[in-house]
Amino acid sequence: MRDPVDYFHNSLVPMVVEQSSRGERAFDIYSRLLRERIIFLTGPVEDQGASLIVAQLLFLEAENPKKEISFYINSPGGVVTSGLSIYDTMQFIRCPVTTLCVGQAASMGSLLLAAGEAGHRFALPNARIMVHQPSGGFQGQATDILIHAREIEALKKRLNEIYVKHTGREYETIHQALERDNFMTADAAKEFGLIDDILHKRPEPAAA
């Protein structure tokens, strides 16, 4: 049986109808925007959604390896390994990736926001950005719990190193900033180095 929540959300995705010499074609709005090299991360970061974003990044690179990709982020975060799969692909492909926070970029969402092309990481004025250390839970034998605790510590260190790379901050500064949930306005995120600028209006196209 189809998940009623999925059905509800999918039924609200608008369709765009285009006319051409070959007739009429209909696209869902996200597929139409993908043609303009625009990708969305909306909602929690998880394996299935991350795989779709990775596939879109690879497809757009194959289409044109030098043309910019715009990555819009509105996410509360989610699974660390899923987020890292997107992050690694962003760094792997040859296309520059512009990131833009609309709404919120929390946890892994903030890391992906910061991972955009230097000078091309943006947020809208009322966006909220939150950074913190990874969390997790595990039940089982004491030895297994210790193994998982060590894995979380290793992930924490790696995430700190990634934030250091993209913000230019010292490791200790990042370590302290991520000890607890750390919410920022767009202005604070810019000062911290997570973004490069705040966009109030879309820039006018350059005159021909």
Curated annotation (Swiss-Prot):
GO terms for molecular function: ATP-dependent peptidase activity; ATPase binding; serine-type endopeptidase activity. Its EC number is 3.4.21.92. It is an enzyme of class 3 (hydrolase). Keywords: Cytoplasm, Hydrolase, Protease, Serine protease. It holds the Pfam family CLP_protease. It comes from the Bacteria. GO terms for biological process: protein quality control for misfolded or incompletely synthesized proteins. The active site is at S107, H132. It is found in: Cytoplasm. InterPro entries: ClpP (IPR001907), ClpP/crotonase-like_dom_sf (IPR029045), ClpP/TepA (IPR023562), ClpP_His_AS (IPR033135), ClpP_Ser_AS (IPR018215). The keyword Nucleotidyltransferase does not apply. It catalyses: Hydrolysis of proteins to small peptides in the presence of ATP and magnesium. alpha-casein is the usual test substrate. In the absence of ATP, only oligopeptides shorter than five residues are hydrolyzed (such as succinyl-Leu-Tyr-|-NHMec, and Leu-Tyr-Leu-|-Tyr-Trp, in which cleavage of the -Tyr-|-Leu- and -Tyr-|-Trp bonds also occurs). One of its GO terms (cellular component) is endopeptidase Clp complex. Fourteen ClpP subunits assemble into 2 heptameric rings which stack back to back to give a disk-like structure with a central cavity, resembling the structure of eukaryotic proteasomes. Belongs to the peptidase S14 family. PANTHER family: ATP-DEPENDENT CLP PROTEASE PROTEOLYTIC SUBUNIT. HAMAP family: ClpP. Cleaves peptides in various proteins in a process that requires ATP hydrolysis. Has a chymotrypsin-like activity. Plays a major role in the degradation of misfolded proteins. This is ATP-dependent Clp protease proteolytic subunit.
